[in-house]
Structure formats: structure tokens, C-alpha cells
């Protein structure tokens, strides 16, 4: 599987997603590792097995084994953090002052440049809808030297990958298939 396979599987009403997927796959705003890791972490966070397999197949040759593991780890740890910190942010009370008491060691030692891991964490946090985490990771990557355009590119990747995953899930449930070319 590949990004081309995903595009072929999208129904005709998702033409914009096909175009966005193509343009983002060829985007040069981010480094190859940053782009590939953002795609991989976003695919995992989008919870669609076919999308995850296709995107990992597309980008595993771009990433070192350590970087591939780090992208997976960003999706995993943000799956935990985004829920916990979204709760802390949404309710009033003592929770913000209480220790989380959850292991998050990978954040301190991700196995890749911290800036790349933070960017991938930002993309996953955008998918998972944790405003507190988005703000925190955005601040770190901007202070680390990434431009607003680079941050926007990562979030565009996250949004597009998530939309592709949701559309393919919906199309499968409804029996929507692309028109025969």
C-alpha cells in the first residue's frame, strides 16, 4: 500500500482530500524526516489500519528505525497525554496542581531530535483535540526555530490524514466506492 493506493480508494466526493494528500506528500517546507514522521504519527493517531499501513509503507524508507519508532512513540504518548491534559484543562479544581503520576519518559528521550518529536506530538495533539497540548508543543517548536509555515504544514498533514481516515471509514460503512476510471 501507498499514498497512491489511499487516493485511489477515496470516493469521488473526497477529491479535495486526494489533492491535499498529493500536495502535502511532496511538500518541501519540512525536512524529509519531519514530514515523514508527521505523516506516520498522524496516521497512527487517526486510528485507521489501512491508512496507517499505507503511510508507514510510503515513509519507512525515509525514516531511520529510530525515527520510525519515535514517530510511533509520539502517537502513543500523545494518546495518553492528550486525554489526561484535555481533562485537566476542561475542569476547574485542583487537578492542574496535582502530579499526573503517569509515565512519560519517551518525551525526555525520544531517540530523535527533540524538535522533530515535538512537531510530531503537535500534529497528534491537533488530531486528538487537546488545546493545552497544542499550545505547549507549538510554543516549543516555534522557540526551537520552526516557522509558522512549518507548523502549519504539520497541522495540514494531520488534518488531511485524519480526514482521509474518517472518509475511508465512512465510505466502507456506506459502501461508497470511487467511480471506475
Curated annotation (Swiss-Prot):
Swiss-Prot/TrEMBL keywords: Antioxidant, Disulfide bond, Oxidoreductase, Peroxidase, Redox-active center
One example of a Gene Ontology biological process annotation: cell redox homeostasis
InterPro entries given in the database record: AhpD, AhpD-like, AhpD_core, CMD-like
MF annotations from Gene Ontology: alkyl hydroperoxide reductase activity; disulfide oxidoreductase activity; hydroperoxide reductase activity; peroxiredoxin activity
Catalytic activity field: N(6)-[(R)-dihydrolipoyl]-L-lysyl-[lipoyl-carrier protein] + a hydroperoxide = N(6)-[(R)-lipoyl]-L-lysyl-[lipoyl-carrier protein] + an alcohol + H2O
Gene3D superfamilies, per the entry: AhpD-like
Enzyme Commission number: 1.11.1.28
Family annotation (NCBIfam families): ahpD, ahpD_dom
PANTHER family: ALKYL HYDROPEROXIDE REDUCTASE AHPD (PTHR33930:SF7)
Family to which this protein belongs: Belongs to the AhpD family.
Protein name per its UniProtKB record: Alkyl hydroperoxide reductase AhpD
Organism, scientific name: Gluconacetobacter diazotrophicus (strain ATCC 49037 / DSM 5601 / CCUG 37298 / CIP 103539 / LMG 7603 / PAl5)
Gene: ahpD
Amino acid at each position: 500500500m501507498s499514498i497512491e493506493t489511499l487516493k485511489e480508494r477515496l470516493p469521488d466526493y473526497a477529491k479535495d482530500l486526494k489533492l491535499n494528500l498529493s500536495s502535502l506528500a511532496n511538500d518541501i517546507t519540512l525536512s524529509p524526516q519531519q514530514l515523514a514522521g508527521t505523516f506516520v504519527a498522524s496516521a497512527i493517531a487517526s486510528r485507521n489500519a489501512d491508512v496507517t499501513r499505507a503511510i508507514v509503507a510510503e515513509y519507512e524508507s525515509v525514516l531511520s528505525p529510530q525515527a520510525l519508532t519515535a514517530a510511533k512513540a509520539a502517537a502513543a504518548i500523545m494518546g495518553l497525554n492528550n486525554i489526561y491534559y484535555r481533562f485537566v484543562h476542561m475542569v476547574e479544581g485542583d487537578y492542574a496542581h496535582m502530579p499526573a503520576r503517569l509515565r512519560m519518559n519517551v518525551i525526555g528521550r525520544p531517540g530523535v531530535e527533540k524538535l522533530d518529536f515535538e512537531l510530531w506530538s503537535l500534529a497528534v495533539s491537533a488530531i486528538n483535540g487537546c488545546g493545552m497540548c497544542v499550545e505547549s508543543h507549538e510554543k516549543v517548536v516555534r522557540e526551537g526555530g520552526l516557522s509558522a509555515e512549518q507548523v502549519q504544514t504539520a497541522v495540514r498533514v494531520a488534518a488531511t490524514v485524519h480526514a482521509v481516515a474518517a472518509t475511508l471509514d465512512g465510505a466502507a460503512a456506506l459502501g461508497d466506492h470511487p467511480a471506475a476510471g
